């Protein structure tokens, strides 16, 4: 005990002398000046002698505190035969034994834990780390039942025989060494460490320690062979950074590990992993051997199956080694099957081959607490950060190796991902490439955002992510509070590039906000670029809606397009949209090209798309590439991902457009010029110059179900459309939820508010909505709102083939009008109102709904305007019919409830309207109705 106390005094003296040496010199000088009249020239020599005297006194006192073992070292060997010998060495000066050989004789097996009571620190110190040899007599082993690390400071140049530790009490200390520093060694010496769970009484018991090595200092190189008893669970805990092999690895350290064990608990405050708690820049962990770990539990702020957190670190797995591990990883900030958190900032490419980790089947979860809502959980990385510029990180596997994402989400976390919980990048020019990855998601998670590959691409992070040859199967109940994506749950701003064969399977998935087979939600800008074969036949939301979609649930301002040859297999289990607005722009190898002189071009290094813009908003469209260019600019602001020069989006929404040739945009994925969600309004002009424009919206390739504004122009105000031949087909379900947005369909304009001029337009319009909720369908305009300004139709002809194809609905929710579906109430009395002059209407208008078994049901149809609505307190609408020809128009309705009514050649119910009727000619037209009342002319009130 005295030696140990003296040892502490010695260390304190040394530290005080080192720290306050300059103060001693200053003090002595000041005293001399105050109490003597000594000449300045003599003061320097006197002070030097005084300081030397103080120094010698401190040195002598320090030397006296060590146990002298000089005479015990024989030919460089210190022999330990009993506990007293060992304690004598522990209390000796590290400078004396730094390079000696410590020989444990066979008598050391008699050590007991009680022999070392009160000893807290092992051999070596920062100034004199142990660099010698520790060995046992031949045929014997080194058994140490100690509660402290054998070495306080150990050099990686030291040679150690196999050491068997038995930790009798729970202590926040390492097993072998608190610190390992780099010595003069070319390659790592192998250190064999075993854990013996036998205490003084012979009971099977093992107490916790923080790690085998606490901290590896800069440049240290270690090769550890660790054997833990198979029948006892070892607990690694108590440190800020906890890992069985090492708590923390400083920069440029290297650790090789061979592990024989089956059961392990690792818990740390900040970082915890089976092998290492924290790895600093350029640290390397090599796993040369690892038995199957069948009962492992890891917990910390940043918890990882292998490493808690790492920066620019390298993990190598030996040839023929595949890691197999079951148990749990629970993090309050991050939880990852391999890494809780990983940051990469180097200039060269980084590759993670995850095929070696296919046996990692840890149950991943977030612990409860204040950080849960922002916590990230992933089967490989909880959080992955690319903080470099223009650097590629690759995550690759093989088709035969499956990564299992076993989520145990009893506590709601921020983000869950099949590979990465949350990813962020410093630059769009960098890349995260995932290829040849097979992911099985099992268990359940309760997350804000969930993705089959990435839960969330971080806020304000501009990231490029490529996905190739990947299969994702989400098998059990995985719910998302907000957004759910087959590849990415939530992308603040991201470019998702999909190629090769990509298959996503997830049945009846749900989220409060958005569901998509590729991306759940884009918050701001982004791009989805589709190539190869995309199979989403097994992916569908439980309750399809306008944001529960096949490809992207909420696309925000994202551009979505496909390359030539892209094949897409959709689900047949549900009728759902591809995305919440628009469709996939389908490029080809003929006229819609990914090239600078066609529609758009892709910068493969900067990861941006440039649309071939227009110099101003007086534009001529001569082919469908021109149409696509104009449409893309109307739909997208120029941003970091999608760029163009010249006319802006605002300019294009007020453009003067002319056709110089016939244009067919069918099968391009374009649904018109604009976003079909009613977000923007066209106020410009379109002169067709007697050319034909053909469009088909809602094909087998591009399903349209919940899109609200469907037409050449989604929304107009003050627009002028003239000299155009328009052939349009709208295969739209129009099944918006009850109480939600209505569906508007019109070949020219889905929804108009304000003035509108349609002159010399010939339209052949086909539409067949079948949804059970509100649809306003018109041959030219779906809905006219507040017609206080003039809405005129002149010198035009419409062939309207409109069918409400729902015989089971019990509500009369759909208006079918040959020219206008419905006119809303006005806010003030119009001067002119709605005018028809020299307009011809023909075609087939069919309402198949029969209504409820009792009550009333009306067929809201009409050859001109199906219905004019009214607010009781509003001013009347004005309709002027100067010259209208109803020619070869067949109206057929199916309502048959007592009291039901059916519209006819002109309309159904026109409320609060002043009608000026000059000339109507009806010829070759029929009305077929099973309702009790049908109206050749509308009911005008």
How would you describe each model-predicted region?
Residues 1-46:
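Gram-positive cell-envelope targeting signals
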Residues 45-935, 941:
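Surface-exposed repetitive/solenoidal architectures
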């Amino acid at each position: 005990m005295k030696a140990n106390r003296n040892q502490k005094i010695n260390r304190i003296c040394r530290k005080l002398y080192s720290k306050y040496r300059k103060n001693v010199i200053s003090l002595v000088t000041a005293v001399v000046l105050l109490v003597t009249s000594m000449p300045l020239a003599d003061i320097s020599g006197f002070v030097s002698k005084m300081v030397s005297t103080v120094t010698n006194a401190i040195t002598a006192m320090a030397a006296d505190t060590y146990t002298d073992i000089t005479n015990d070292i024989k030919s460089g060997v210190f022999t330990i035969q009993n506990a007293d010998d060992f304690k004598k060495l522990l209390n000796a000066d590290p400078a004396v034994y730094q390079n000696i050989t410590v020989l444990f004789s066979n008598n050391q097996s008699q050590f007991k834990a009680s022999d070392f009571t009160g000893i807290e620190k092992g051999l070596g110190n920062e100034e004199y780390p142990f660099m010698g040899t520790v060995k046992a007599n031949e045929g014997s082993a080194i058994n140490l039942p100690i509660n402290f690390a054998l070495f306080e400071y150990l050099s990686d140049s030291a040679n150690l025989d196999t050491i068997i530790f038995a930790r009798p009490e729970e202590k926040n200390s390492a097993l072998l060494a608190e610190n390992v520093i780099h010595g003069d060694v070319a390659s790592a010496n192998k250190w064999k460490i075993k854990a013996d769970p036998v205490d003084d009484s012979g009971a099977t018991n093992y107490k916790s320690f923080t790690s085998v090595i606490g901290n590896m200092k800069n440049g240290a190189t270690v090769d550890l062979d660790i054997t833990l008893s198979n029948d006892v669970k070892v607990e690694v805990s108590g440190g800020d950074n906890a890992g069985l092999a090492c708590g923390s690895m400083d920069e440029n350290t290297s650790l090789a590990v061979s592990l024989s064990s089956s059961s392990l608990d690792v818990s740390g405050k900040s970082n915890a992993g089976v092998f290492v708690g924290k790895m600093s820049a350029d640290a390397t962990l090599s796993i040369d051997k690892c038995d199957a770990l069948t009962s492992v539990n890891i917990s910390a702020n940043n918890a990882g199956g292998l490493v808690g957190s790492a920066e620019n670190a390298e993990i190598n797995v030996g040839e023929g080694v595949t890691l197999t591990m079951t148990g749990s990883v629970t993090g309050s900030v991050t939880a990852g099957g391999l890494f809780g958190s990983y940051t990469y900032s180097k200039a060269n490419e980084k590759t993670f081959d995850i095929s070696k980790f296919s046996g990692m089947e840890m149950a991943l979860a977030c612990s409860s607490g204040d950080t849960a809502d922002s916590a990230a959980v992933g089967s490989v990385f909880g959080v992955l950060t690319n903080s470099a510029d223009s650097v590629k990180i690759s995550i690759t596997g093989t088709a035969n190796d499956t990564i299992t994402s076993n989520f145990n989400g009893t506590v709601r976390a921020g983000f869950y991902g099949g590979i990465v919980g949350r990813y962020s990048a410093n630059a769009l020019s960098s890349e995260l490439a995932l290829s040849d990855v097979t992911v099985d998601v099992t268990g359940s998670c309760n997350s804000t955002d969930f993705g089959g590959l990435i839960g969330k691409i971080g806020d304000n992070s501009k990231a490029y992510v490529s996905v190739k040859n990947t299969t994702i199967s989400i098998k059990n109940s995985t719910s998302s509070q907000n957004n759910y994506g087959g590849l990415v749950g939530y992308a603040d701003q991201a470019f998702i590039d999909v190629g090769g064969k990509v298959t996503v399977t997830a049945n009846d998935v749900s989220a409060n906000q958005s569901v998509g087979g590729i991306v759940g939600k884009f918050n701001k800008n982004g791009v989805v670029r589709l190539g190869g074969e995309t199979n989403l036949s097994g992916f569908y939301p439980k309750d399809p809606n306008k944001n529960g979609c096949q490809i992207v649930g909420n696309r925000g301002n994202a551009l979505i397009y496909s390359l030539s040859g892209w094949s897409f297999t959709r689900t047949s289990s549900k009728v759902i949209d591809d995305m919440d607005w628009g469709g996939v722009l389908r490029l080809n190898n003929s006229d819609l090209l990914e090239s600078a002189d066609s529609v758009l071009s892709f910068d493969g290094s900067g990861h941006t798309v440039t649309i071939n813009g227009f110099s101003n908003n007086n534009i001529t469209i001569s082919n469908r590439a021109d149409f696509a260019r104009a449409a893309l600019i109307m739909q997208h602001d120029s941003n970091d991902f999608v760029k163009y020069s010249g006319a802006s989006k605002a300019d294009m929404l007020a453009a003067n457009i002319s056709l110089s040739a016939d244009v067919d945009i069918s099968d391009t994925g374009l649904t018109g010029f604009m976003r079909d969600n009613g977000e923007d309004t066209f106020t410009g002009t379109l002169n067709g110059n007697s050319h034909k424009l053909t469009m088909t919206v809602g094909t087998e390739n591009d399903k349209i179900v919940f899109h609200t504004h469907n037409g050449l122009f989604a929304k107009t105000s003050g627009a002028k459309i003239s000299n155009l031949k328009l052939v349009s087909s709208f295969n739209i379900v129009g099944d918006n939820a009850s109480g939600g947005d209505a569906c508007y369909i019109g070949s020219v304009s889905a929804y108009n508010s304000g003035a509108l001029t349609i002159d010399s337009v010939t339209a052949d319009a086909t539409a067949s909505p079948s949804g059970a909720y509100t649809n306003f369908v018109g041959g030219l305009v779906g809905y006219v709102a507040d017609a206080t300004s003039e809405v005129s139709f002149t010198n035009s002809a419409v062939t309207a083939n409109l069918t409400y194809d729902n015989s089971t609905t019990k509500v009369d929710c759909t208006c079918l009008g040959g020219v206008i579906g419905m006119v809303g109430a006005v806010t003030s009395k119009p001067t002119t109102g709605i005018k028809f002059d020299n307009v011809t209407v023909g075609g087939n208008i069919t309402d198949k709904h029969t209504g409820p078994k009792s009550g009333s049901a009306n067929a809201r149809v009409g050859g001109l305007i199906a219905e004019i609505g009214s607010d009781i307190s509003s001013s009347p609408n004005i309709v002027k019919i100067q010259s209208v020809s109803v020619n070869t128009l067949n109206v057929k309705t199916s309502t048959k409830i007592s009291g039901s009514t059916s519209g006819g050649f002109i309309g159904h119910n026109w409320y609060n309207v002043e009608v000026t009727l000059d000339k109507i000619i009806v010829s070759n037209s029929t009305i077929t109705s099973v309702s009790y009342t049908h109206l050749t002319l509308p009911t005008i009130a």
